Regions:
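C-terminal substrate-recognition "lid" of short-chain dehydrogenase/reductases
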Residues: 66-96, 101
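Short, flexible, glycine-rich and Lys/Arg-enriched loop motifs at helix boundaries
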Residues: 104-106
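Catalytic Tyr-x(3-8)-Lys segment
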Residues: 50-72
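Alpha-helical segment proximal to the catalytic Tyr-Lys
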Residues: 18-22
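Rossmann-like NAD(H)/NADP(H) cofactor-binding core
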Residues: 23, 28, 92
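Active-site helix of classical SDR
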Residues: 5-6, 13
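Short, flexible catalytic-loop segment of classical short-chain dehydrogenase/reductase
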Residues: 31-43
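Residues in well-ordered alpha-helical elements
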Residues: 10, 38, 71-74
Length: 106
């Protein structure tokens, strides 16, 4: 299901990029990986602060071996929004996931 959703986001992003590109409007998306936050804290951390089994599985599938930090998402958004650094970037989905989407598990 995740693959289908990711492909849907890519298709929509690319369609919007083509549709609005002639007007000078860029359309890009960010595909975040796993970030520890208040809403998922109990799923990822035990009462003593150690990782749950679920968190260990996520970390094992993330080549960088950790959860993302909010400022890493902010950096990606600022890059994509910048007319100086990304004025010719259009129609992409930028993974900010520590390599999770690239990892095959071997």
């Amino acid at each position: 299901m995740l693959v289908l959703q990711t492909q849907d986001i890519l298709n929509l992003t690319q369609w919007l990029a083509v549709h609005f590109g002639e007007s000078g409007i860029r359309c890009n998306a960010i595909a975040p990986g796993f970030y520890a936050a208040e809403q998922n804290h109990d799923l990822l951390f035990n009462a003593d602060g150690t990782y749950t089994d679920r968190a260990r599985k996520i970390i094992a599938g993330t080549p960088m071996g950790r959860f993302g930090k909010p400022e890493e998402l902010i950096g990606a958004a600022l890059f994509l929004a910048s007319d100086e650094t990304a004025s010719f970037v259009n129609g992409i989905v930028l993974p900010v996931d520590g390599g999770y989407s690239a990892y095959s598990g071997v």
